[in-house]
Amino acid sequence: MFIYAIGTETRQKIGISKNPHKRLKQLQTGNAEQLVLHHMIEVHDDRTRLLERFLHKDIGYKKLKGEWFNLTKQEAKDYLTFAEITWVNDPLLSLKL
């Protein structure tokens, strides 16, 4: 499973998918703005939803609606890279929710 950042220059959807490229096509359907897969990290299946919930909570102050956040593509890439280094294998992640 992957956690991805798909969006525009200034708005990002942070979500999970087995196939982020397919998910991009699904999200693009009916969306007037051109969406791009900006970044993705691979996460063990048993930790994917936990990490996604944690990320959504951690950047909740930038939330727009649903899983969409007020993040530039570079902020999203930097954030997911940081998450991969810091939290993907953190055994105490569930305690941080």
Give the ranges of each region predicted by the language model.
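Non-catalytic accessory segments flanking enzymatic or RNA/DNA-binding domains
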Residues: M1-L97
